[in-house]
């Protein structure tokens, strides 16, 4: 690590501590040239996989898009924003845990449907009707029947 005071390349770690519930490492460093001390923080960089759309176009994972889709389905439903954030974090963790560099929109959509099914059945039906392109009332009935099983 470069010294912020003299730009020397050689520094040594004097002290390391976990901070932020163990999600960060705080390090005290000392420059071996000018002997100044400074603090650095390290955080793991969690990379989300790219998303492959149905038309084969690949795009970066967009958390805002995921959130807005879920919030649209949950509109005027009695679900707390904390529950929505927990569901979003669960979906993101699941996607990262696949270890894949790319995931399909189908996989993301299925994870959203699973999360909504646990949060609110009405929101689940709303999302499923758009995601699965329900054509008529019969398809709504079939999905509701599956929910009741």
Swiss-Prot record:
Q: Report unnamed zinc finger ranges.
A: 3-34
Known cofactor(s): Zn(2+)
Q: Which Gene Ontology molecular-function terms are recorded?
A: ATP binding; DNA binding; zinc ion binding
Q: Where is the ATP-cone domain positioned along the sequence?
A: 49-139
Q: Which Pfam families match?
A: ATP-cone, Zn_ribbon_NrdR
Q: A GO BP term, please?
A: negative regulation of DNA-templated transcription
Which keywords, in A-to-Z order, does the entry hold? ATP-binding, DNA-binding, Metal-binding, Nucleotide-binding, Repressor, Transcription, Transcription regulation, Zinc, Zinc-finger
The record describes how the cofactor is bound as: Binds 1 zinc ion.
Family, per the entry? Belongs to the NrdR family.
NCBIfam families, per this entry?
A: transcriptional regulator NrdR (TIGR00244)
Q: What does this protein do?
A: Negatively regulates transcription of bacterial ribonucleotide reductase nrd genes and operons by binding to NrdR-boxes.
Which named protein is this?
Answer: Transcriptional repressor NrdR
Source organism of this protein record:
Pectobacterium carotovorum subsp. carotovorum (strain PC1)
